[in-house]
């Protein structure tokens, strides 16, 4: 069908249009160790249909069906650009991709901000990207190249918050649940009253994060009380970006409900942890702050990536 020029990255250069079991992809890139496909699909966020773009990397040096990692970017997409030049992801997912391929996983990265000029400061505009991940999982599970009994989910920051939604009762009817999930640096200022899931969760926090530990401790306590298997890892000396050069700066963050996080109740509605009723207005007034964080030498990030992939590997069926 011809060739397509794209912005070159360190991962690929030649793009060939083709078709696969996923439907007509935008592009397929060839590499001695993996092939990759970029494709678009429709999903829903807060009642509105949205376009989503995703890229998958498939190892070619091992036989399938392959286990799959779905990875979700944070608020800043500061990592690799997709092969088509449109979608992109963050540094966390970029390293999950590289290391996941080396360990024999298919890795699928989705861009939840596709065709929207959403910046890290635009937190009130962030979509409900967990639905995007579920729809992507459904697409991947239908492809015979992939092991639909071993599909994993991870994300950083905003992406980690989406991972937390996998314990929300509104998604309990998910026909093919994740094999395991991992949340890297979730903020935990708003989370669902958790149900008991069939899969374990790994939660990783930095001890010096401006998204403080206390609300995540509350979430972990509730997860365990519901009967979930939770592994918690605290990275000493690491900030939100798993770096050692962190400092507090001025910037929009959802970290004001450190000691009284917002909880989406199983019976419906929202309440603060102290039992008081919550509204969107109260959530914005109490939980949104100008206390941001910076410092991105990422000294601890490779350790985090190894822990996540090791966790997934140890939970394969």
Model-derived regions, located:
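N-terminal cap/lid segment of alpha/beta-hydrolase-fold proteins
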Residues: 30-64
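Short substrate-entry loop that stabilizes the transition state in hydrolases
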Residues: 62-66, 71-117, 209-213
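A conserved short beta-strand
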Residues: 173-188
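Short beta-strand/loop motif that positions the catalytic acidic residue
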Residues: 203-205
């Amino acid at each position: 069908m011809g060739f397509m020029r794209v912005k070159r990255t360190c991962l690929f250069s030649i793009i060939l249009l083709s078709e696969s079991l996923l439907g007509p992809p935008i592009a397929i890139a060839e590499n001695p160790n993996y092939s990759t496909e970029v494709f678009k699909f429709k999903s829903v966020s807060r009642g509105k249909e949205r376009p989503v773009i995703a890229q998958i990397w498939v190892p070619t040096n091992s036989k399938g069906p392959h286990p799959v990692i779905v990875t979700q970017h944070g608020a800043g997409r500061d990592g690799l650009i997709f092969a088509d030049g449109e979608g992109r992801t963050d540094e966390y997912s970029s390293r999950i991709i590289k290391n996941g391929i080396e360990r024999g996983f298919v890795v699928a990265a989705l861009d939840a901000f596709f065709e929207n000029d959403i910046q890290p400061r635009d937190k009130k505009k962030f979509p409900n990207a967990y639905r995007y991940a579920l729809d992507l999982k459904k697409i991947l599970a239908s492809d015979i190249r992939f092991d639909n009994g071993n599909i994993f989910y991870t994300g950083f920051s905003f992406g980690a918050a989406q991972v937390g939604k996998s314990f929300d009762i509104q998604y309990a009817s998910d026909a093919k649940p994740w094999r395991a999930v991992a949340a890297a640096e979730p903020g935990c200022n708003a989370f669902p009253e958790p149900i008991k899931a069939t899969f374990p969760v790994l939660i990783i926090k930095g001890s010096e994060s401006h998204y403080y530990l206390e609300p995540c401790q509350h979430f972990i306590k509730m997860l365990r009380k519901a009967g979930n298997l939770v592994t918690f890892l605290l990275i000493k000396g690491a900030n939100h970006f798993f770096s050692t050069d962190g400092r507090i700066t001025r910037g929009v963050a959802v970290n004001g409900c450190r000691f009284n996080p917002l909880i989406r109740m199983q019976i419906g509605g929202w309440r603060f942890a102290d039992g008081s009723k919550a509204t969107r207005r109260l959530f914005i007034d109490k939980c949104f702050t100008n206390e941001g964080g910076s410092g991105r030498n990422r000294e601890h990030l490779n350790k985090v990536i190894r822990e996540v992939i090791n966790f997934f590997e140890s939970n394969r069926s």
